[in-house]
């Protein structure tokens, strides 16, 4: 018993004879100075899929997915039965049948989008009913529409999304990307659309043999309204509430809030709402979710991380987060962010007015005890074992350890380190070299636009002072010609070499010796300041002739007398830039 309590409240479990070494160094440390960690939200859909492939193969190589079998990914049934479809033919029944609690996360997002669209179409439907000529004609129109919808329903392919056509213009991509924002009248609805073609698909079905077209733009965040609303309210009113998520609540008020969210109304929680009622509502949402927030096909893999050292555990959790569907990972990140803010206010502090602010007493361990079993639940795809795992660790204790580590390191879990970015770049290039080039150039344009905006904002705030400071900074960073360091790279040459790298020129893409992706910026590109009229596909080399100033160019009449001394022999020759072979720097000599 003492050993179990030790495991529960210690930072990690006792060392085991066999440990799993995870790819990469310590979490949060960047071993490659040329690249920075980036958020998974900045990755396009194609990059996100390649990131999942990279994490999957890495975890398989480290024996983290030994319990996972891809052949368990069987086709799923239609999410809507015939009886439910008949109930949804009418607008009122359809809106009332779309729930929020007790269903899968994907269905929650789909229902929110459907309810919003239904509210927009309700006035139009009422006008059509008023303008109808006779009741029989209206009944005939209803029957005709019902039969037409039934024909379309039964003629729909098995794995086709169940939303209307206007909802799924980008459904073939499996996830809605930011480039489809202009295709919807209300851009806010875009955030609620999700991976419709991958609905309820286990990890094996998501990774094996996908032939869908992928977007090259980032995926929109997919967070349910109830999670976003409750987290915002708790962050605003509950950070100083002692014992939040554990104090008694009003059951009647929780049921009222639950009914409001089931109706799909745009709920605004004001100061009159008790924060403990909102906290209980959030707990019930995750507890009653049909599928756990952490996918059940990764259940044993998450528990296995509890046997690692803290550094290796966070790295393993990072790879497992990459394998989660976007809607699950986005919702998990939003929840962990709110829980981490609560832990930052667990101790007493002194306020701005000098008064003592009591802490909420909710550490990461206490919060993990509350959400451990709600986030990590054994589902239908998990092996039916006893409560003790093969490693001799209690499931409950292991789940608390995992959730606690995720709360403490929530900001690292959703970042992509440089060495993973390199692997993703390899896989993207192997599938589509043009896509990799497009992504790099797009990121370059974003960086250029951001820097231009920063400069404009600085000049607008104080034009005279900031312009002088900017010029002084540029002059301070520029070095004299005679003090040029040996081998210093030129920004333009490095950028051109990176953007126009020939992968097929006597180099194997899989060979690390021939291709060092550390010098090829993937998601953190060096800004390109070259002229827009220049040809970016031409890489200047040392074989080009140096530009000679017009004042030193000899006339054709004097070329024949090259053996003689020029008229201005007594004057010193001007310094002419000369490309030095094998060096990136530009040397000047007299």
UniProtKB/Swiss-Prot annotation:
Q: Which CDD domains match?
A: RhoGAP_ARHGAP6
- Record text on subunit structure and interactions: May interacts (via the Rho-GAP domain) with the active form of RAC1.
Q: Which Pfam families match?
A: RhoGAP (PF00620)
What biological function has been recorded for the protein in this entry?
GTPase activator for the Rho-type GTPases by converting them to an inactive GDP-bound state.
| PANTHER family in alphabetical order | RHO GTPASE-ACTIVATING PROTEIN 36 (PTHR12635:SF8), RHO-GTPASE-ACTIVATING PROTEIN 6 FAMILY MEMBER (PTHR12635)
Q: Coding gene?
A: Arhgap36
- Region annotation Disordered: where it falls in the sequence: 526-590
Enumerate the residues marked as the site Arginine finger: 246
Q: Which residues form the Rho-GAP domain?
A: 214-414
Any one Gene Ontology BP term: signal transduction
- The protein's name is Rho GTPase-activating protein 36
Gene Ontology terms for molecular function? GTPase activator activity
Classification via InterPro entries? ARHGAP6_RhoGAP, Rho_GTPase_activation_prot, RHOGAP6/36, RhoGAP_dom
Which keywords has UniProt assigned to this entry? GTPase activation
């Amino acid at each position: 018993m003492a050993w179990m309590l030790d495991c529960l409240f210690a930072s990690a479990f006792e060392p085991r004879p066999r440990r799993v070494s995870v790819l990469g160094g310590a979490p949060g440390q960047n071993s490659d100075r040329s690249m920075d960690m980036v958020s998974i939200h900045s990755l396009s859909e194609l990059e996100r899929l390649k990131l999942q492939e990279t994490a999957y193969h890495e975890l398989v190589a480290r024996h983290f997915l030994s319990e996972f079998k891809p052949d368990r990914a069987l086709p799923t049934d239609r999410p809507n039965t015939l009886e439910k479809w008949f109930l949804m033919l009418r607008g009122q029944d359809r809106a009332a049948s779309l729930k929020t609690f007790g269903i899968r996360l994907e269905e929650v997002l789909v229902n929110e989008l459907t309810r919003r669209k239904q509210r927009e179409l309700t006035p139009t439907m009422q006008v059509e009913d008023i303008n109808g000529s006779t009741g029989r004609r209206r009944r005939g129109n209803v029957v005709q529409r019902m039969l037409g919808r039934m024909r379309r329903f039964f003629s729909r392919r098995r794995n086709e999304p169940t939303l209307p056509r206007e909802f799924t213009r980008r459904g073939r991509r499996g996830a809605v990307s930011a480039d489809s924002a202009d295709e919807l009248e209300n851009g806010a609805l875009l955030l609620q659309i999700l991976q419709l073609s991958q609905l309820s698909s286990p990890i094996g079905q998501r990774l094996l043999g996908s032939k869908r077209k992928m977007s090259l733009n980032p995926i929109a965040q997919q967070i349910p309204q109830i999670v976003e609303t409750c987290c915002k309210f708790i962050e605003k009113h509950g950070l100083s509430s002692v014992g939040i998520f554990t104090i008694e609540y009003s059951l009647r008020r929780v049921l009222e809030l639950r009914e409001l969210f089931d109706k799909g109304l745009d709920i605004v929680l004001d100061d009159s709402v008790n924060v403990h009622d909102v906290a209980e509502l959030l707990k019930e949402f995750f507890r009653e979710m049909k599928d756990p927030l952490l996918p059940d096909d990764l259940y044993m893999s998450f528990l296995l991380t509890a046997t690692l050292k803290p550094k290796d555990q966070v790295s393993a959790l990072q790879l497992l987060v990459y394998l989660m569907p976007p809607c699950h990972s986005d919702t998990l990140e939003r929840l962990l962010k709110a829980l981490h803010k609560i832990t930052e206010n667990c101790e007493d502090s002194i306020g701005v007015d000098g008064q003592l602010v009591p802490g909420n007493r909710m550490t990461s361990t206490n919060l993990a005890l509350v959400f451990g079993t709600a986030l990590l639940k054994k589902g239908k795809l998990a092996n039916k074992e006893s409560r003790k795992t093969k490693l001799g660790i209690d499931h409950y204790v292991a789940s608390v350890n995992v959730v606690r580590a995720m709360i403490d390191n929530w900001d690292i879990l959703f970042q992509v380190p440089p060495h993973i970015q390199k692997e993703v770049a390899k896989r993207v290039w192997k599938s589509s070299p043009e896509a990799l080039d497009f992504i790099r150039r797009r990121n370059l344009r974003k960086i250029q636009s951001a820097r231009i905006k920063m400069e404009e904002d600085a000049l607008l705030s104080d034009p005279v002072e900031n312009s002088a400071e900017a010029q002084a900074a540029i002059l301070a960073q520029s070095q004299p010609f005679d003090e040029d360091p040996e081998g210093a790279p030129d920004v333009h040459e490095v950028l051109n070499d990176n953007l126009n790298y020939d992968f097929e020129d006597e180099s194997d893409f899989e060979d690390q010796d021939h291709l060092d992706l550390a010098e090829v910026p993937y998601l953190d590109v060096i800004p390109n300041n070259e002229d827009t009229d220049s040809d970016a596909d031409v890489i200047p080399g040392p074989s080009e002739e140096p530009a000679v100033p017009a004042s030193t160019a000899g006339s054709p009449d004097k070329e024949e007398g090259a053996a003689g001394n020029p008229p201005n022999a007594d004057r010193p020759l001007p310094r002419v830039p000369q490309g030095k072979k094998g060096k990136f720097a530009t040397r000047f000599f007299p």
